[in-house]
């Protein structure tokens, strides 16, 4: 857990959690839309977003590297991840902020396709421009990415 006095680490964790939740929401909306033949009603989109956020706490975790917890969120089963109460809270709160009703239309727009471009656009729009969770558009785009992860891990 970040130290109580480490505001920078908390800010990065919130940004990384937002990006991971945003990626999961875009992916799940695109998959549900594809399953339904390209059409997704608002009610179905809302149910999909609620289900994604309900799973966020269980599926998202902080990656482990050399036996240490990093600031990088992942949901890949092939990646060693740390989980726990505060990690779950970061993931769930990030997802809940994105589906609070204010950003649902944007998520439905980004959720029309599941590719890196849609995810990056959604991160920038939602995690930076709309919520201010990430301090810059570049921070939102770089969140949880390998190059940024390596740089952060060296700094720890």
Regions found by a protein language model. Give the residues of each.
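Extracellular/luminal segments of secreted precursors and ectodomains of membrane proteins
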Residues: 3-156
């Amino acid at each position: 857990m970040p130290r109580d006095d480490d505001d920078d680490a908390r800010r990065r964790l919130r940004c990384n959690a937002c990006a991971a939740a945003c990626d999961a929401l875009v992916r799940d909306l695109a998959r549900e839309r594809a399953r339904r033949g390209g059409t997704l009603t608002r009610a179905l989109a809302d149910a999909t977003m609620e289900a994604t956020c309900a799973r966020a706490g269980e599926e998202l975790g902080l990656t482990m590297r050399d036996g240490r917890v990093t600031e990088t969120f992942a949901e890949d089963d092939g990646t060693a991840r740390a989980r726990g109460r505060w990690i779950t809270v970061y993931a769930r709160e990030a997802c809940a902020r994105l589906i609070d009703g204010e950003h649902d239309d944007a998520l439905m727009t980004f959720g029309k396709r599941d590719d890196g471009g849609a995810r990056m656009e959604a991160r920038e729009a939602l995690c930076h421009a709309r919520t201010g969770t990430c301090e810059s558009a570049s921070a939102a785009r770089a969140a949880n990415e390998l190059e940024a992860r390596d740089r952060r891990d060296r700094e720890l």
